[in-house]
Amino acid sequence: MDSQGKKVVVCDNGTGFVKCGYAGSNFPEHIFPALVGRPIIRSTAKVGNIEIKDLMVGDEASELRSMLEVNYPMENGIVRNWDDMKHLWDYTFGPEKLNIDSRNCKILLTEPPMNPTKNREKIIEVMFETYQFSGVYIAIQAVLTLYAQGLLTGVVVDSGDGVTHICPVYEGFSLPHLTRRLDIAGRDITRYLIKLLLLRGYAFNHSADFETVRMMKEKLCYVGYNIEQEQKLALETTVLVESYTLPDGRVIKVGGERFGAPEALFQPHLINVEGVGVAELLFNTIQAADIDTRAEFYKHIVLSGGSTMYPGLPSRLERELKQLYLERVLKGDVDKLSKFKIRIEDPPRRKHMVFLGGAVLADIMKDKDNFWMTREEYQEKGTRVLEKLGVTVR
């Protein structure tokens, strides 16, 4: 709470999950899937102890997903369906989750870097007009990740469910001209895993199977350190084969798909996306930075978001960066490679890093009036109140 007794809420609206809670806390109060479902057939009124409603949100929708047509209001970090997004926020602020009176609260929201201004304007409009929060702040996710890690300078590789960003931050300011965006993230890897499983003869084609495959991905997938070696193992042996039990009791076997699906992060052409993979994008970003800041950036690469949780990802990233540096900067001179210092930080709680950073920032700033956009300012200026965010508060 701030000095006037107003609650300060932190809400990290991801493409796949909503993480919400309060300023100063060190873990989200609630984490639930960002999905909205509508029943396909109204044959039963109850399943177990959950009542089937015309509109199901979050955890409830996830549990009953086999009976629902499920929609994700956000795609690639951007709100695509505002009506469903409002249902998601109603659920977040309502009795099921935070149970707050939004008129007496301030809220810190997060957004991906390079988010369209239109999207931000609409968020502000909904927060002030529909929910009537007394103060709102929208923070850039990458900056919050660094705050949570106790850094002011570094490069954040943030890969969630909808979008992957590589965002250099210098002295607490994100550098938009160097920020790179890769529209491959968790959801695309899940889709690709569905495709690979189809080639093995397993069909997952209902909208609800998507969640099932996502859970399988989180349990079994990893990033291969040496892809040729992994492929050889997959073809010639059964060491990679794991059994997985589906919700309906069937057991399926998964092998080379375990490293094949996340490989799309490093080789986008596998899923028909143009451009370079995450390692080369990271290398290009740092090399495009001012020469005096490059060494700092290489030493402070911070991973963030659920799609960086694959075992093997940090070491693969480091291997590819060293390889690229050797080829393109040192022109193949191996002796000089020992001077090249690189450090990839993979904090264990990186799945919720953005929320944690938001909780820290909101707590520090809870009584600073020039930090928050207020309801009065919004009534006076409309969406021009966003100019207040143009200045990064340090």
UniProtKB/Swiss-Prot annotation:
InterPro entries: Actin (IPR004000), Actin/actin-like_CS (IPR020902), ATPase_NBD (IPR043129)
Keywords in alphabetical order: Actin-binding, ATP-binding, Cell projection, Cytoplasm, Cytoskeleton, Nucleotide-binding, Nucleus
Protein's cellular compartments: Cytoplasm, Cytoskeleton; Cell projection; Nucleus
Signal peptide start and end residues: none
SMART domains: ACTIN
Alphabetized Gene3D superfamilies for the sequence: 3.30.420.40, Actin, Chain A, domain 4
Quaternary assembly: Component of the Arp2/3 complex composed of actr2/arp2, actr3/arp3, arpc1b, arpc2, arpc3, arpc4 and arpc5.
Family from the record: Belongs to the actin family. ARP2 subfamily.
Protein name from the UniProt record: Actin-related protein 2-A
Organism: Danio rerio
Species classification: Eukaryota, Metazoa, Chordata, Craniata, Vertebrata
